[in-house]
């Protein structure tokens, strides 16, 4: 039996499920089955991106699960994708979305996000590089990119548009010129990076915040032995024992109770189901505060590249790098 899910309502009137299936780092060959299983057990929100390289498989899963005689209508499933950095030029934006729609086998997206605030060099190279391994950038202003994204809503190709990995200053910048307002800001969010200030800013402007890596991205390839591990926090372990559930469910319930949308990634059926089963219990006010007190503004997701043989943050030197601001 499918699990029922709670929603946040976007300013557009769309209902966005509080738990979605993340597909970042889900390998081709695994992601199709994961999406099909998720839709079968009650997920109604799938988070995708062109750069993940698996939208064709996600599209196959949606096609086999959604439509006439398949038990699920298209309007019941909330699908998000993201514009990659090499397609920020206003002339490239619609083509980029049409490519994603073609891969996903859809007529429209429920939400289309600008993945990062800065642009890479125009063209078909996803990560255009200089000879030393550093990224080749382009000077396209994200406000011009946004204006092109607004036309996608006018054309019915996206029901809503939004931002990802933007800081408050950059979000305010977009809001100052937007005719079509951003509906969502997607950022890394978990108890070590609670994003309380950003959540408050979003709410004051009518945006919903989506948190990625809600479990601390335990499968990231660049983890270091000294990195803190969310799932091993004694307080989280104790709560999981008390409620007889997993540590992951405690972390997801904390977000759901804060009305933060989260998109945990998994390709394991048992975990996919478990991650959705967070709507039949509540954490006490004290437990919510204990989890919130873990905040240390610790960021797991900082893209790295190899330059001259050394691993360095990919975009930290860029003037639009979002993580130099406090939030």
From Swiss-Prot:
InterPro entries: AKR, AKR1A, Aldo/ket_reductase_CS, NADP_OxRdtase_dom, NADP_OxRdtase_dom_sf. The active site is at residue 52. One of its GO terms (cellular component) is cytosol. It is found in: Cytoplasm, Cytosol; Apical cell membrane. It catalyses: a primary alcohol + NADP(+) = an aldehyde + NADPH + H(+); S-nitroso-CoA + NADPH + H(+) = sulfinamide-CoA + NADP(+); S-nitrosoglutathione + NADPH + H(+) = S-(hydroxysulfenamide)glutathione + NADP(+). Catalyzes the NADPH-dependent reduction of a wide variety of carbonyl-containing compounds to their corresponding alcohols. Displays enzymatic activity towards endogenous metabolites such as aromatic and aliphatic aldehydes, ketones, monosaccharides and bile acids. Acts as an aldehyde-detoxification enzyme. Also acts as an inhibitor of protein S-nitrosylation by mediating degradation of S-nitroso-coenzyme A (S-nitroso-CoA), a cofactor required to S-nitrosylate proteins. Also acts as a S-nitroso-glutathione reductase by catalyzing the NADPH-dependent reduction of S-nitrosoglutathione. Belongs to the aldo/keto reductase family. This is Aldo-keto reductase family 1 member A1. It comes from Xenopus laevis (African clawed frog).
């Amino acid at each position: 039996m499918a699990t029922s899910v709670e929603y946040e309502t976007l300013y557009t009137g769309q209902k966005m499920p509080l738990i979605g299936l993340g597909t970042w780092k889900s390998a081709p060959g695994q992601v199709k089955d994961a999406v099909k299983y998720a839709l079968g057990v009650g997920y109604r929100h799938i988070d995708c991106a062109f750069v993940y390289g698996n939208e064709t498989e996600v599209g196959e899963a949606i096609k086999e699960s959604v439509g006439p005689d398949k038990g699920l209508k298209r309007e019941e499933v909330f699908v998000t994708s993201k514009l990659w950095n090499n397609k920020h030029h206003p002339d490239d934006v619609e083509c980029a979305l049409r490519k994603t729609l073609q891969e996903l086998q859809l007529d429209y997206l429920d939400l289309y996000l600008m993945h990062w605030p800065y642009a890479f060099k125009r063209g078909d190279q996803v990560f255009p590089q200089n000879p030393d391994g550093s990224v080749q950038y382009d000077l396209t202003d994200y406000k011009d990119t946004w204006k092109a994204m607004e036309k996608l809503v006018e054309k019915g190709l996206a029901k809503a548009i939004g931002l990802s990995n933007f800081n408050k200053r950059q979000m305010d910048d977009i809001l100052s010129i937007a005719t079509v307002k951003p509906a969502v800001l997607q950022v890394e969010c978990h108890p070590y990076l609670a994003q309380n200030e950003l959540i408050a800013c979003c709410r004051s402007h009518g945006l919903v915040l989506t948190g990625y890596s809600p479990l601390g991205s335990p499968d990231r390839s660049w983890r270091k032995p000294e990195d803190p591990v969310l799932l091993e926090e004694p307080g989280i372990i104790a709560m999981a024992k008390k409620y007889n559930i997993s540590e992951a469910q405690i972390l997801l319930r904390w977000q759901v109770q804060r009305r933060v949308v989260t998109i945990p990634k998994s390709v394991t059926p048992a975990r996919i189901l478990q991650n959705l089963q967070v709507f039949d219990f509540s954490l006490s006010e004290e437990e919510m505060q204990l989890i919130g007190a873990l905040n240390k503004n610790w960021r797991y997701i900082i893209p790295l590249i190899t330059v001259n043989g050394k691993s360095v943050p990919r975009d930290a030197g860029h003037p639009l790098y979002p993580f130099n601001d406090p939030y």
